């Protein structure tokens, strides 16, 4: 993987790990302090807001990130791009906030969603403005390649939200207190982010007039296509919540949202790759380096499969333990929807890097078509299954919609001009998952102490998974060290040295055993480890623990 891209991914992943940890700590507190019903109302409001903000901010944020990253020789290119999108951001935010206030004042909100929701939409109107400039500032910094600034702003956003929202929820302010947390956090990030942007490009460029050669039409066309794409993506995220609110109680919505939250934890690495790849591959596309792009995309697909699969297997093995501990006993109904969502979450994770590379080219026709097929299937299935099966139907429909994304975007990628499966090794990655799942689930089964299971199963399961990945060839021996080489020293330098030594020994004489022999060997090893866990370890662990 290109080192600059890898370091960019590492920067984003590092921050996402921190944000995920903070979110993981705050989410169960919100669930407990609000209760399932109010948490369901909060989840519903966020889903409506996310869909609404597509039309307010998506064209701005995606556009400024893409066009700033392009290597153009036009005079004052960066200033003109920043100014163009800043003006657009101001106008769209003003219109977006006004329309929400108008809908609340005219009673449209109460008629559509029920009494009591109008007050929340006044808060959402203010959030439209602050969220618009928060996202504009962060994506502008990313367009400049300044992830070292843009990503810590996410930590500021999360910490500020927690500091405000959790105490307000605890003292009984309810959903409005949590929305106030979002408002304060986004305002702080917007101010800090715009101050950093101003150091790179003075925001007085707001009043500058670009030349006639400035590609306004191309930018607006990209904005329109980007809005369509993001709308389709967001429908996959949120249409199930919106539909479930119509047919089931707020408590069901809250528990289903709890299941979604855990399933979406699988996406933090794929999201980081997607975030960096959009602007990192734009330059490769401008240089027409298709072979490099295919190599990059297929390896990203393989790494995403392996990382997401091991997390999915671990979460499935520990679901009965993790959900009640994490959210409380009231969230036990979320366990089955969570298990139904995991296969689809894996498929969606695989689609993310592929979509990002396609976005980097700027031609969104095929990605939109691919996403549209998955989104349409998702809407149809949710409409068919939710009225009868509730949150279980929503989970099945959403999982199928998510999984379809990977298939559709593989087709889209070939149309765009790259092959995301060139070095993906999907069969070997799938075999790794199946073989490793048996001992991991067996280990989780035999450990009866829940806290001990949470401490032991994830690290041991990861080692088992990586071992099988190396045995079946889903990973080359040097690749784990190649990934570690982008970490700070001393880890990075030592991993790089080990990687070089492995690559020096990596001649093409490795096929000494047939594939069938290797398959039989690893299958036998999987059964052996499973039997060991169920037999010897089961007796030993249960004798040591209460």
Where are the predicted features?
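Membrane-interface junctions at transmembrane-helix termini in multi-pass inner-membrane proteins
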Residues: 129-154, 176, 342-374
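Signature of the first transmembrane helix
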Residues: 3-61, 93, 97, 101, ...
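Hydrophobic alpha-helical transmembrane segments
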Residues: 122, 153-202, 260, 373-378, ...
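Membrane-proximal transmembrane or re-entrant/amphipathic helices at the cytosolic face
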Residues: 442-546
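Helix-loop junctions and terminal segments of transmembrane helices
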Residues: 56-73, 143, 263-304, 308, ...
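Interfacial segments at transmembrane-helix termini and the short loops linking adjacent helices
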Residues: 106-124, 316-349
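C-terminal transmembrane helix end/exit motif
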Residues: 147, 167-168, 183-211, 399-449, ...
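Interhelical loop/hinge segments that connect adjacent transmembrane helices in multipass membrane
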Residues: 172-175, 179, 193-237, 280, ...
């Amino acid at each position: 993987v290109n080192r600059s891209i890898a370091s960019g991914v590492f920067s984003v992943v590092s921050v996402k790990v921190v944000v995920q940890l903070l979110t993981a700590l705050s989410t169960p507190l919100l669930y407990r302090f609000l209760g399932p019903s109010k948490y369901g109302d909060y989840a519903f409001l966020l889903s409506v807001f996310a869909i609404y903000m597509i039309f307010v901010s998506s064209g701005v944020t995606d556009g400024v990130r893409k066009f700033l990253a392009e290597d153009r020789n036009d005079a004052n290119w960066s200033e003109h791009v920043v100014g163009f999108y800043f003006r657009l951001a101001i106008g769209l935010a003003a219109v977006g906030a006004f329309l929400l206030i108008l809908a609340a004042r005219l009673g449209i909100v109460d008629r559509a969603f029920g009494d009591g929701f109008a007050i929340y939409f006044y808060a959402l109107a203010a959030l439209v403005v602050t969220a618009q400039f928060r996202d504009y500032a962060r994506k502008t910094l990313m367009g400049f390649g300044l992830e070292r600034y843009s990503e810590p702003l996410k930590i500021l956003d999360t910490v500020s939200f927690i500091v405000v929202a959790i105490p307000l929820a605890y003292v009984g302010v309810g959903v409005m207190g949590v929305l106030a947390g979002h408002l304060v956090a986004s305002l702080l990030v917007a101010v800090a982010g715009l101050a950093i942007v101003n150091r790179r490009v003075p925001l007085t460029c707001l009043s500058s007039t670009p030349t006639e050669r400035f590609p306004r039409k191309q930018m607006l066309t990209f904005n329109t296509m980007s809005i369509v794409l993001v709308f389709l993506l967001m429908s996959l995220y949120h249409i199930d919540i919106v539909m479930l609110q119509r047919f089931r109680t707020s408590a069901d919505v809250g528990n289903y949202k709890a299941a979604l939250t855990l399933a979406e934890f699988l996406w933090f690495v794929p999201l980081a790759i997607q975030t960096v790849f959009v602007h990192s591959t734009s330059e490769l596309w401008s240089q027409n380096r298709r072979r490099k792009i295919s190599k990059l995309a297929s390896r990203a697909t393989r790494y995403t499969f392996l990382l997401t699969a091991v997390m999915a297997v671990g979460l499935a093995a520990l679901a009965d333990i993790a959900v009640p501990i994490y959210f409380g006993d009231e969230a036990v109904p979320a366990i089955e929807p969570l298990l139904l969502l995991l296969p689809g979450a894996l498929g969606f994770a695989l689609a993310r890097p592929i979509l990002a590379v396609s976005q980097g080219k700027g031609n969104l026709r095929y990605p939109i078509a691919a996403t549209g097929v998955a989104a349409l299937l998702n809407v149809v299935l949710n409409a068919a299954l939710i009225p009868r099966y509730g949150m279980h139907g929503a989970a099945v429909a959403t999982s199928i919609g998510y999984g379809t994304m990977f298939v559709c975007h593989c087709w889209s990628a070939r149309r765009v001009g790259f092959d995301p499966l060139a070095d993906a090794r999907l069969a070997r990655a799938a075999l790794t998952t199946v073989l490793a799942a048996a001992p991991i689930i067996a280990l989780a089964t035999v450990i009866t102490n829940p806290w001990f299971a949470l401490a032991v199963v994830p690290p041991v399961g990861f080692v088992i998974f990586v071992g099988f990945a190396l045995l079946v060839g889903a990973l080359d021996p040097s690749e784990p060290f190649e990934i570690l080489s982008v970490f700070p020293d001393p880890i990075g330098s030592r991993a790089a040295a080990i990687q070089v030594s492995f690559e020096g020994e990596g001649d093409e004489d490795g096929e000494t055993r047939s594939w069938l022999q290797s398959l039989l060997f690893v299958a036998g090893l999987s059964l052996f480890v499973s039997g060991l866990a169920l037999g010897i370890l089961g007796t030993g662990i249960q004798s040591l623990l209460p």
